[in-house]
């Protein structure tokens, strides 16, 4: 059983090292993880940093121009040979050194085509945390406004071979399109694990470009939902986790992130 972790980056010299360290220090890295990095021909020191680690660890990487983040992610899919794929892009990092191993039994069963967990979103300016959790069985109303966090979603490689990859004519919304198709249209087998997989730093284009997000979301909502689905959506309410649960998860996140930061500083 092999998990391919794919990191897409461009001009991320201040963020890429933390991401790499969270992967290569996984307790099962040597046995069960294939690491693939797709660099978009960075003009800063990103490629140099990647090479430093690729000289020490078995990292498969390329540095070449791409036409956007989803083009780069599709390149990562093609280069990967794992049974399951996880996208952990520059700046994001796995929550602790044993998180992949903790899911080994689920991966080895091969029962599910998609496995999704929770993630923590952190604002780098305020250091405030928000819980990113999803329903155990997300339905069409969920995908109308939200999506699965790719930093905490494992896709069977054969899913991409069967249904295709990310649509490359969008900048932000292709995650939403893919996940909606897989779970609502194609009804792939899926499993939610109620544990935190990763930390997502909210400073990427999807977090900061509200105008573009709104424009693409309108296209998505107009073109990827049937009239019947729209009726279902209007008839439902999205239930969010309780404030008490969110508060507890934020506290746990702070502790785990401090541990991860200490491990990175001490080379563990």
Give the positions of each predicted feature.
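Short aromatic/hydrophobic "clamp" motif used to bind/position activated sugar donors
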Residues: 85
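Conserved nucleotide-sugar donor-binding catalytic segment
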Residues: 131-220
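A conserved acidic beta->alpha catalytic loop
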Residues: 38-48, 89
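Short, well-formed alpha-helical segments that are part of the catalytic scaffolds
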Residues: 12-26
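Conserved donor NDP-sugar-binding/catalytic core segment of glycosyltransferases
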Residues: 97-129
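Glycine-rich, basic loop-to-helix element that forms the pyrophosphate-binding segment
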Residues: 63-80
């Amino acid at each position: 059983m092999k998990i391919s972790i794919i990191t897409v980056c461009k001009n991320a010299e201040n963020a890429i090292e933390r991401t790499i360290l969270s992967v290569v220090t996984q307790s099962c890295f040597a046995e069960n993880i294939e690491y693939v990095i797709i660099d978009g021909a960075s003009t800063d020191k990103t490629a140099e940093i990647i090479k430093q680690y690729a000289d020490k660890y078995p990292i498969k990487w390329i540095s070449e121009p791409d036409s956007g983040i989803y083009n780069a992610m599709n390149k990562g899919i093609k280069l990967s040979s794992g049974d399951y794929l996880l996208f952990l892009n520059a700046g994001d990092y796995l929550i602790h050194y044993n998180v992949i191993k903790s899911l080994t039994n689920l991966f080895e069963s091969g029962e599910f085509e998609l496995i999704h967990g929770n993630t923590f979103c952190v604002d780098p300016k305020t250091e405030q945390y928000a819980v990113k959790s999803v329903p155990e069985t997300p339905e069409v109303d969920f995908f109308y406004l939200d999506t699965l966090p790719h930093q905490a979603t494992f896709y069977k490689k054969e899913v991409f071979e069967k249904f295709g990859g990310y649509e490359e004519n969008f900048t932000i919304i292709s995650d939403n399109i893919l996940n909606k198709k897989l779970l609502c249209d194609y009804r792939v087998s899926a499993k939610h694990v109620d544990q935190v997989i990763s930390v997502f730093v909210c400073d990427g284009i999807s977090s900061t470009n509200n105008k573009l997000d709104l424009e693409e979301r309108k296209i998505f909502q107009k073109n990827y939902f049937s009239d019947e689905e729209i009726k279902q959506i209007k008839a439902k309410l999205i239930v969010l986790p309780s404030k008490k649960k969110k508060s507890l998860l934020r506290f746990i996140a702070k502790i785990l992130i401090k541990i991860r930061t200490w491990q990175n500083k001490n080379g563990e």
